[in-house]
């Protein structure tokens, strides 16, 4: 007797459901796409328990005829293609005829539908893919499909379901993408009876962007357009100042279908060129109309992977359109607009400084672990300009990003005289005047870490410190060196977060898309480890009323956004990695940059601090802080050491 058997239809549908119905969001996607294909102008999605208990999709589309309702639950039954030729000119979102039977096989499904041609509607009830009831229904134009108790008959699938908040976030993301793809349709998402998202459906894509990402984001989006013989490109991209740490905010649409394509993502970044910082990604919504013959959507059951003909030409079109859009306007960030994230604007009076920092050597304050212009230079400028007060502007000082009022001389004096509590722990008890360095202790640490005993010679290009020792010549990157010093300080500091808080006179507001808001609402307690306490405030917003004393107020907004990005982009949150990323970020931003001259005294102080580090050889991002040219290397460069012909001949003899 043969061993091969034909599986029954119910089992075959459950197997197919493994590909089509991965999670509740997959059900929402398939049902809403069917509603879009039915010509709906209004679609409402209601969920309970993140879709596991109930998913209900209601539309005002064409509806189904009575004889088609039962047939819709048969595998490979569809109204969207009729022959193989149709497979290569698909304009609908669905075409396989697998979604409804697959969903019905792992749930309890109810379909209520009617169309304009029939006097009454039809109601179908199915359980596990088996039709139990098929009866007439009072007429209501459109269709309502309810999916209850998802995966009730496949409990093993429930083991792989994440938290309800995570599943709800995926559902919200699906609705967000479909709303961006079809601004002409009004979408409403309801969770547990509460409205989560609503779009106007008036065809204005920018209004949809505002509904999803917030008005502030929509204001910073630039419209793009482009076309050639094969493609028509429209959409919006964000100004370079508005970025995130991952690609989740890039939406690419092919004929109204959300797709994922690495090369098209790369084309978007190429369009920005060097306007974007490394590791940052823009907001983008690109809608591409293409001849269906040039796109093969029959690649994967989810239909998110699409093979494109003339892909390189499309990449060029995208890059060119973005570059032209960003080149047309002024890209200087609006300072006042960027302050709108505050609940109240601070009223401050600042005076523009005339201090040419680039031309004045900086000195290193070991207590503050930072670089400052010498007081004599400031007093000289004060004397020459007859100015009573100037605003200190030191771009290398992490604590000063916005102008401050008051006398510069007073501020510098305060900084050099006062002992900052922040750095007390890193300042050796037995300090030498001027630098506060315990040379005996440093020597021991240097020996333990095998860090060379360096003699400072000069500064090269206002960026590198030229040093020597008995082992040869050394070049030290001043930015990487201080970044390593500050990284080790901040890593310890963040690991021992003080609960001391500074109340903000003007609290900060952080607006997120609904799907990100859901995730952060679940994980915001993780920020407590860093002394950051966010409260839910209004729709899709968090408010920060106070900040930890270790976080400077001038960097609050940027730093908190970086923390949020880390949490949202990490599938598994690691406090250790989080502290590393945060410490690396703060250290990099607050360290002295290239092209800043240092005097010899300050350069030596920086080298001594570097020698005390646990790992003085690389910065927090892995770049080397120091490179070495041995005596032999230098002699070889000047051909003082040469290999003889005899030695080469001997080496060839070894191979015989």
UniProtKB/Swiss-Prot annotation:
GO terms for biological process: mismatch repair. Belongs to the DNA mismatch repair MutL/HexB family. Residues 411-427 have a biased composition (Basic and acidic residues). It comes from the Bacteria. Residues 385-427 are annotated as: Disordered. Gene3D superfamilies: 3.30.230.10, Histidine kinase-like ATPase, C-terminal domain, MutL, C-terminal domain, dimerisation subdomain, MutL, C-terminal domain, regulatory subdomain. Keywords: DNA damage, DNA repair. This protein is involved in the repair of mismatches in DNA. It is required for dam-dependent methyl-directed DNA mismatch repair. May act as a 'molecular matchmaker', a protein that promotes the formation of a stable complex between two or more DNA-binding proteins in an ATP-dependent manner without itself being part of a final effector complex. It comes from Lactococcus lactis subsp. cremoris (strain SK11). This is DNA mismatch repair protein MutL. Residues 387-410 have a biased composition (Polar residues). The keyword DNA damage applies. One of its GO terms (cellular component) is mismatch repair complex. PANTHER family: DNA MISMATCH REPAIR PROTEIN MLH, PMS, MUTL (PTHR10073), DNA MISMATCH REPAIR PROTEIN MLH1 (PTHR10073:SF12). One of its GO terms (molecular function) is ATP binding. CDD domains: HATPase_MutL-MLH-PMS-like, MutL_Trans.
């Amino acid at each position: 007797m043969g061993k091969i058997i034909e599986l029954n239809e119910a089992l075959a549908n459950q197997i197919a459901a493994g590909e089509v119905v991965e999670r509740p969001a997959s059900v929402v996607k398939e049902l809403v796409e069917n509603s879009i294909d039915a010509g709906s102008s209004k679609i409402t999605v209601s969920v309970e328990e993140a879709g596991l208990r109930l998913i209900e999709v209601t539309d005002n589309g064409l509806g189904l005829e009575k004889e088609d309702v039962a047939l819709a639950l048969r595998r490979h039954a569809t109204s969207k293609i009729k022959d193989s030729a149709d497979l290569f000119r698909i304009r609908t979102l669905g075409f396989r005829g697998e979604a409804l039977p697959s969903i019905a096989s792992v749930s309890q499904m109810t379909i209520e539908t009617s169309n304009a041609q029939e006097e009454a509607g039809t109601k179908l009830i199915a359980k596990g893919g088996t039709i139990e009831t098929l009866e007439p229904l009072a007429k209501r134009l459109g269709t309502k499909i309810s999916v209850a108790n998802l995966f009730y008959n496949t409990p093993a699938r429930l083991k792989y379901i994440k938290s309800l908040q995570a599943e709800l976030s995926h559902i919200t993301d699906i609705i967000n993408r479909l709303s961006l793809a079809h601004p002409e349709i009004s979408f409403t998402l309801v969770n547990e009876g509460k409205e989560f998202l609503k779009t106007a459906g008036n065809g204005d894509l920018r209004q949809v962007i505002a509904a999803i990402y917030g008005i502030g984001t929509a204001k910073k989006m630039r419209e793009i357009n482009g076309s050639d013989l094969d493609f028509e490109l429209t959409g919006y991209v964000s100004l370079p100042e508005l970025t995130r740490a991952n690609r989740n905010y890039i939406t690419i649409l092919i004929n109204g279908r959300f797709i994922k394509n690495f090369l098209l993502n790369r084309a978007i970044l190429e369009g920005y060129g060097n306007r974007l910082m490394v590791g940052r990604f823009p907001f983008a919504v690109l809608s591409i109309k293409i001849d269906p013959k040039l796109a093969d959507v029959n690649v994967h059951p989810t239909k998110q992977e699409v093979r494109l003909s003339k892909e390189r030409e499309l990449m060029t079109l995208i890059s060119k359109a973005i570059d032209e859009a960003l080149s047309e306007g002024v890209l200087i960030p609006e300072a006042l607009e960027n302050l709108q994230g505050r609940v109240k604007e601070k009223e401050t009076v600042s005076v523009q400084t005339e201090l040419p920092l680039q031309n004045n050597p900086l000195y290193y304050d070991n207590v503050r672990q930072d670089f400052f212009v010498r007081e004599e230079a400031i007093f000289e400028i004060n004397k020459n300009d007859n100015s009573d007060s100037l605003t200190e502007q030191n771009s290398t000082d992490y604590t000063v990003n916005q102008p401050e009022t008051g006398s510069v001389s007073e501020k510098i004096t305060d900084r050099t005289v006062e002992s900052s509590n922040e750095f007390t722990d890193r300042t050796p008890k037995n300090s030498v005047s001027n630098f506060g360095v315990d040379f005996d202790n440093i020597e021991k640490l240097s020996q333990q870490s095998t860090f060379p005993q360096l003699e400072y010679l000069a500064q090269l290009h206002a960026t590198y410190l030229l040093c020597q020792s008995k082992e040869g010549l050394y070049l030290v990157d001043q930015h990487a060196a201080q970044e390593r010093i500050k990284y080790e300080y901040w890593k310890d500091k963040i690991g021992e977060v003080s609960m001391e808080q500074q109340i903000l006179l003007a609290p900060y507001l952080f607006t997120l898309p609904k799907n990100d808001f859901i995730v952060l609402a679940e994980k915001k307690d993780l920020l407590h480890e860093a002394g950051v306490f966010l409260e839910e405030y209004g729709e899709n917003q968090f408010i920060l009323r106070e900040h930890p004393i270790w976080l400077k107020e001038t960097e609050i907004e940027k730093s908190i956004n970086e923390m949020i990005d880390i949490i949202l982009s990490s599938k598994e949150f690691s406090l250790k990695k989080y502290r590393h990323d945060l410490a690396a970020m703060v250290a990099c931003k607050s360290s002295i940059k290239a092209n800043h001259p240092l005097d010899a005294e300050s350069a030596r102080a920086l080298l001594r601090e570097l020698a005390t580090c646990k790992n003085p050889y690389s910065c927090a991002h892995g770049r080397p802080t120091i490179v070495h040219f041995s005596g032999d290397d230098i002699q070889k460069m000047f051909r003082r050491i040469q290999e003889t012909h005899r030695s080469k001949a001997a080496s060839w003899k070894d191979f015989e």
